[in-house]
Each structure stands twice: as C-alpha cells, then as structure tokens.
Amino acid sequence: FPASPNIKPQLADQWAFGYFRNFMDNSVETSAEIYYKKLDNLIDFKDFASLLLNDEMEADVRAGKGHSYGLELYTRISKEKLDGWISYTYSRSQLRTASEEMAEKINDGNWYASNFDQPHNAVLVGNYEWSKRFSTSLNTNYSTGRPITLPVAKFNYGGSERVYFSDRNGYRIPDYFRIDLSVNIEGNHKVRKLAHSSWSLGVYNLLGRRNPYSV
C-alpha cells in the first residue's frame, strides 16, 4: 500500500554485525552475520477483510509494528576442480497491531508470524570438473514452510454455518526441499573454430518431492 492521509509511511531501523575471513590462499571464503530490524507503521489485513472489488481497501487494513532478527552463515570453496558454496540462515519475522481497541487488533494484539517468517533456510551449490570437458553440478535448497491461517472448526449461529479460524499464521505449509542435478559437456577446445558448443543434461527436483507453494 502507498502512503496516504490514512496510512503512514512504513519505517525501518536495522542493526547488523558481521565477521568475514578467508583461508587457504583465499580458496575458502567464510562469513557470519547477525542482524536485528525494527519496523513501524506496518499494515496487515484485518480478519475477514474483503479483497475483491473493494473501493475502500484502506478500511480493511490495520497498522502495527514488527521486528525481525536472524543469523546468516556462508562458506565458499574455490579450488582446482571444485567450486561451490553453502549457506544457512536462521531468521524470524513477527508483527503486532498497535490499536488500543480489542476489536481492531489482529490475533488479539499478540505477536504473530509475518507472511515472510521462515526460520530455517539452507542452500548447497557445487560444481565439480571431472575433466576439461565434463563436469557435474548440484543445487540443493531447503526452507521452512511459510505460515498460513487455517479453519480449525465450524459451528452454527443464527441458522447459518460459521467457520472458526486458527490464530493468525498459526500453521505452516510443509517444508520446501529440492535437489537439482546436471551433467555438463563442453565442446572441443580447438582454437581455430567458428563456434563453441556445450551440452547440459539436468534433472530438476531429483527426489520428485511435491513442494506446495500455497494452500
């Protein structure tokens, strides 16, 4: 949402501390960083907000504050035949509405996970050269499933069926995990040639895991 007379500009203050060091003639690169971010005037949709054909969308959002913090680790290796890196991130992102009136609060005014709250994220990327023409590449990704709000019960009220939902973002979709593998073949390296060719045969999602994106 853009800032308007009814919606204040969003503000953020961030602090970070990092340590970086290389080893073995710079063939190994490492880093570690921690951070904390304080956010103000964040907005989120109220419960049962109307999102379609709504000319007064600003009336269905609530302002609040938030914070996020985390740790990032990274290592890269670059040697004669092996080149790759591995990273791991632990992070949390939470929100809370600032309204004084209980009816205006989301999640009863308690902290809740933002839509971007994914505590664990890990990536492994590597390439190994078996020869000047043949190499193998690996790409592995893992992340915690993002948070969602689910209906947990239903009841009858006034002759109609009603749905009771969980706390805001009280559940998560299944974790995401994927491995990609490829074999790369370079053309010959003759100096006098009009063009250079290369072939790559890859398998996306090697384990065939069904990774949900949205529920």
List the predicted regions and their residue ranges:
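Outer-membrane beta-barrel signature, preferentially recognizing the C-terminal barrel domain
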Residues: 1-31, 36-38, 50-79, 115-119, ...
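C-terminal beta-signal and adjacent terminal beta-strands/loops
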Residues: 39-40, 133, 141-160, 174-180, ...
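Active-site rim elements
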Residues: 3-5, 110-113, 166-172, 188
